[in-house]
């Protein structure tokens, strides 16, 4: 989880760490709960603004790629 926290800090993303869970606060658009599993991070959408969903949907794939590559480097 340290690499994920480092990534969040480097990208000016607010986060809340609680045990094995990290909640990423991505502006007013996304709030993502990240749970570290054995071989990957699992994400759960907590909040999603549908009005911007079409324009920013690729961000989900980007976040997922970053999280999983971060875990592989750990």
Question: Where do the model's predicted regions map?
Answer:
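Negatively charged, low-complexity tracts enriched in Asp/Glu with abundant Ser/Thr
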Residues: 1-25, 46-64, 71
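A short, structured beta-strand/loop element
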Residues: 28-39, 43
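Extended aliphatic helical segments
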Residues: 32-34, 52, 66
């Amino acid at each position: 989880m340290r690499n994920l926290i480092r990534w969040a800090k480097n990208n000016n993303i607010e986060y809340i760490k609680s045990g094995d869970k990290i909640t990423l606060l991505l502006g007013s658009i996304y709030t993502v709960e990240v749970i570290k599993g054995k071989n990957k991070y699992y994400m759960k959408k907590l909040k999603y603004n549908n009005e911007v969903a079409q324009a920013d949907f690729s961000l989900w794939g980007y976040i997922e790629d970053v999280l999983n590559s971060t875990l592989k480097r750990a």
